From Swiss-Prot:
Name the record gives this protein: Elongation factor Tu
tr-type G domain sequence ranges: 10-206
One Pfam family of this chain: GTP_EFTU_D2
Binding site for Mg(2+): T26
TM annotation in the entry: none
Family matches, as InterPro entries: EF-Tu_GTP-bd, EF-Tu_GTPase, EFTu-like_2, EFTU_2, G_TR_CS, P-loop_NTPase, Small_GTP-bd, T_Tr_GTP-bd_dom
Length: 396
C-alpha cells in the first residue's frame, strides 16, 4: 500500500528525548505520538514499536535509534529516541540525528541522576541549542515541595552547563497517564503543554539554503581555455556567478571569483545547498586548490588547528581498536573530504581511553581546516575509522 504523500506545508523541526535510563523517555515518546495523533492526525506509535529500535550505521558505528514523527498546529516534528545510554552518546557525537532541540525527561520521583547530567553535558558539547524539560512520573509524588525541589535541581544543572536554567520551560506530567488516555492535568493536558513549549521555545531552524555559502572541495580539474573547476556538493547557502568567494583551509586563505556554475553539464547562474556542482574559478591555478579545502562566502568561516572535541571511540566489535590509546596519540582526523594528522591531549584525570568510551579531548592538527563549532569528523588509522567526534570549542 502506498504511503500517503508527505505534505511539507509546515516548518520541519528535529527533536529527541534525552535523560537517565528508566525515567520514561520512550513512554513519553509514545505518549506524544498518541495524544497529538488524536488532535492533528498522523500515526500513533506504541511503546514496543519505539523500544524495538532498528539498528542503523552512521560513519561505521552501529546505533539503535527509533524515529517517530508527529504534528502540532504549527509544525511537523521528527523525533528520535534511543533505547540505551551508549546509543545516545554515539547518536549525539556522530550527529546521526541532528537535534534542533531536546526534551530532557527527568523522573520527579528520583530527581536528576548521572545520565541526566551526562546528557546535558553532551548536549552542550555537541551543540544542541535548546532543551525543554518534561518532569515525568509526577503522579508518584504527592509532596508539592519535593516537586519544587526537583525542578530547582534540574534548573541548576542546566545552568551549570550554560543552558538558561531559569528560563527553561519545565512541564510537569505523567507520560504513563497520558498514554493510558488520562485527560487530566498530568495526562493529556501535560502533553499538550509540552507540544506548546516545543512550538514556542525552539525557534524554526534556518534552512540550509539560507546559510552562508559553503562547499567542501571534492575534486579539482583544469579545463583548457576556461580555467580551474572545483567540484563538490554545496553544503549550505547559494553561490552566484560573479560573486567573490574564499578558498579556506590547509593553505593560507585566498580570494577568487566564481565565473561559472555547472550542473549535469549545463551552465547555471547559481548553485545552492544540496546541488552537486562544478564551480569555475577566475585566475586560480589547479595547484592552488585541493581536496579538504572549502569554498565559502568571504569571512564566513576560518581555518583552525587547535580545538576541544567530544569523541566516541569505536569498540572492538564495531571494527575499532582492540587496545586503549594514551596521551599524545597521533591518528588522522577526517574532516569533510580529507585526512589531517593531529595529536590528542587527554583530560588530566584520564590516563587512557578504552575502545567503547566517550571522552573530551584537545586536538592539535598539523594543517589548518575550515572549522566551526559543531563540525563532525572521524578519527582514522590508516584509512579505517576508529572513532567519531564533534568540535566543541575552537581554541585557535
Amino acid at each position: 500500500m502506498a504511503k500517503g504523500k508527505f505534505e511539507r506545508t509546515k516548518p520541519h523541526v528535529n527533536v529527541g528525548t534525552i535523560g537517565h535510563v528508566d525515567h520514561g523517555k520512550t513512554t513519553l515518546t509514545a505518549a506524544i505520538t498518541t495524544v497529538l495523533t488524536k488532535k492533528f492526525g498522523g500515526e500513533a506509535k506504541a511503546y514496543d514499536q519505539i523500544d524495538a529500535a532498528p539498528e542503523e550505521k552512521a560513519r561505521g558505528i552501529t546505533i539503535n535509534t527509533a524515529h517517530v514523527e508527529y504534528e502540532t498546529a504549527n509544525r511537523h516534528y521528527a523525533h528520535v529516541d534511543c533505547p540505551g545510554h551508549a546509543d545516545y552518546v554515539k547518536n549525539m557525537i556522530t550527529g546521526a540525528a541532528q537535534m534542533d532541540g531536546a526534551i530532557l525527561v527527568c523522573s520527579a520521583a528520583d530527581g536528576p541522576m548521572p545520565q541526566t547530567r551526562e546528557h546535558i553535558l553532551l548536549a552542550r558539547q555537541v551543540g544542541v541549542p535548546y532543551i525543554i524539560v518534561f518532569l515525568n512520573k509526577c503522579d508518584m509524588v504527592d509532596d508539592a515541595e519535593l516537586l519544587e525541589l526537583v525542578e530547582m535541581e534540574v534548573r541548576e544543572l542546566l545552568s551549570k552547563y550554560d543552558f538558561p536554567g531559569d528560563d527553561t520551560p519545565i512541564v510537569k506530567g505523567s507520560a504513563k497517564l497520558a498514554l493510558e488516555g488520562d485527560t487530566g492535568e498530568l495526562g493529556e493536558v501535560a502533553i499538550m503543554s509540552l507540544a506548546d513549549a516545543l512550538d514556542t521555545y525552539i525557534p524554526t531552524p534556518e534552512r540550509a539554503v539560507d546559510g552562508a555559502f559553503l562547499m567542501p572541495v571534492e575534486d579539482v580539474f583544469s579545463i583548457s581555455g576556461r580555467g580551474t573547476v572545483v567540484t563538490g556538493r554545496v553544503e549550505r547557502g547559494i553561490v552566484k556567478v560573479g560573486e567573490e568567494i574564499e578558498i579556506v583551509g590547509i593553505k593560507p586563505t585566498v580570494k577568487t571569483t566564481c565565473t561559472g556554475v555547472e550542473m549535469f553539464r549545463k551552465l547555471l547562474d547559481q548553485g545552492q545547498a544540496g546541488d552537486n556542482v562544478g564551480i569555475l574559478l577566475r585566475g586560480t591555478k589547479r595547484e592552488d586548490v585541493e581536496r579538504g579545502q572549502v569554498l565559502a562566502k568571504p569571512g564566513s568561516i576560518t581555518p583552525h588547528t587547535h580545538f576541544t572535541a567530544e569523541v566516541y571511540v569505536l569498540s572492538k566489535d564495531e571494527g575499532g581498536r582492540h587496545t586503549p590509546f594514551f596521551n599524545n596519540y597521533r591518528p588522522q582526523f577526517y574532516f569533510r573530504t580529507t585526512d589531517v594528522t593531529g595529536s590528542i591531549e587527554l583530560p588530566k584525570d584520564k590516563e587512557m581511553v578504552m575502545p567503547g568510551d566517550n571522552v573530551s579531548i584537545t586536538v592539535k592538527l598539523i594543517a589548518p581546516i575550515a572549522m566551526e563549532e559543531g563540525l563532525r569528523f572521524a578519527i582514522r588509522e590508516g584509512g579505517r575509522t576508529v572513532g567519531a567526534g564533534v568540535v566543541a570549542k575552537i581554541i585557535e
